[in-house]
From Swiss-Prot:
Statement: the UniProt record of this protein carries the keyword Ligase: no
Source organism, top-level taxon: Bacteria
UniProt xrefs under Gene3D superfamilies: Lipoprotein localisation LolA/LolB/LppX (2.50.20.10)
Pfam assignment, any one: LolA
GO biological process, one term: lipoprotein transport
Gene Ontology CC entries for this record: outer membrane-bounded periplasmic space
Signal peptide: 1-18
Name of the protein described by the UniProt record: Outer-membrane lipoprotein carrier protein
Localization terms from the record: Periplasm
UniProt subunit comment: Monomer.
Keywords assigned: Chaperone, Periplasm, Protein transport, Signal, Transport
Amino acid sequence: MNRLFLILLLIFSHEVFSQTSAEVLQSKLNAIQTMTANFSQIVKAKNREVSRSSGSMALQRPGRFRWQTKDPLEQLIVADGQKMWIYDVDLEQVTVKNQEKGLGGTAALFLSGYDETLTHDFDVSEKQKGKLTVFDLKSKSAKENFQRIKLIFSQSTLIGLELYDQLGQITDVKLVQIKSNPKLPAKLFQFNPPKGVDVVKQ
């Protein structure tokens, strides 16, 4: 789970047709400083459904995000730019990680908003699919967690992602009720472990 929300900071802006696909997508990322949305996701392996979940997310670039899964199991992931907390409610356990190590590789760069990430780590192409625009990112490294990422836009709004990992699993994410650049309270990206839970530092 904590590999997925990393990619959900990829958002929208206006298109400049003289730009390359990577530059167009990067401009979309740079246009978003804050974002909120509800999500639903399905993970498939060998054409079979492995898991299904839903919840809400928020991000503030650079480096802050909140990813809350509500169904089927409640989990909260909060990052403040330096540390990341993963709170598994049913286990009554909080795992604390260095944020960069917890995110890893390309995802951390996406979150931090480094402009060179797309062209450095991915080959990017785009195509029209009816009224939708699909950006297809193929990893240049076999070591990346996600070997392929598809970002699906309806006009200027990101409405879905497809993530292909090293194990052959496909994660299909749909976003709804998206708000771009809302004012977000700082406490949204702060976390204090509830009393009585186990805290594990990694």
